[in-house]
Amino acid sequence: MNGMAPPLFEPKERVLQLGETFEKQPRCAFHTVRYDFKPASIDTACEGDLEVGKGEQVTITLPNIEGSTPPVTVFKGSKKPYLKECILIINHDTGECRLEKLSSNITVKKIRAEGSSKVQSRIEQQQQQIRNSSKTPNNIKNSPPKDKMFPSSPMDDIERELKAEASIMDQLSSSDSSSDSKSSSSSSSSSENSSSDSEDEEARPSLPMSMPYLQPQPTLSAIPHQAVPDKDASHNRSQENSGHMMNTLRSDLQLSESGSDSDD
């Protein structure tokens, strides 16, 4: 026996006490729980939760070790009452032995769905808060952009200003081109008028200004078209008369010169 743990139940006489469950109005009850499978991820240092619903349905929620997925393990089943079963409880520190009646036997199976226990509800609340805190920036990031919600960028403002300036410059250039075309047309018309005036002046016959004996000619508007040959004829006659006078003067000069020579 050296090096081995002492036996839990030594062969000696003990005092057996009856527990509170043997009273007429028991203040506590004892149950047995039978699992079909108990995972190693269950944290035995933490407390679990047991719920009894309608129809003797039982839900047991046990927390898993921190970092496990999922965070809890859920069992569901039913309970059946015991008739004459008892449980012996031994306190090895004090050596006390106590006998208690069993109230019911609970048989449960592990399920994948999450239970509705208080522990699970608290865990769900914490997870929901974490999801909400992480979902808020994601919603803002992934929300579709709207033209009315977000202000335009500085590049868009500059582009609009450049387009407005370009349209103004186009309008000014079009107005300048129209004014240039009008001025060029007016200058061309004035040049045409001046050229036509010069042609009219060239077409008009030149009248001798050194003839005082000629009568002034009537205006062109008063002269009929048939009078144009008569004007030319009178002009020719005036030239002949002037030539005759010049001949007479030359002959007079010759006679005067010859007379002066004879006197000498």
Swiss-Prot record:
Pfam families given in the database record: EAF
Spans annotated as Disordered: 114-154, 169-264
Which stretches does UniProt call biased (Low complexity)?
A: 173-196
Where along the chain is composition biased (Polar residues)?
117-142, 239-264
The protein's GO terms of the molecular function aspect are: transcription elongation factor activity
Annotated localization: Nucleus speckle
GO annotation terms (biological process): positive regulation of DNA-templated transcription; transcription elongation by RNA polymerase II
Question: Got a GO cellular component term for this one?
Answer: super elongation complex
> In what ranges is there compositional bias, type Basic and acidic residues?
228-238
Which UniProt keywords are listed?
A: Activator, Nucleus, Transcription, Transcription regulation
Instruction: Please name the InterPro entries in this protein's record.
Output: EAF_fam (IPR027093), Tscrpt_elong_fac_Eaf_N (IPR019194)
What function is annotated for this protein? Answer: May act as a transcriptional transactivator.
- Identify its protein family: Belongs to the EAF family.
Write down what this protein is called.
ELL-associated factor 2
Organism the protein comes from: Gallus gallus
What broad taxonomic lineage does this protein's source fall under?
A: Eukaryota, Metazoa, Chordata, Craniata, Vertebrata
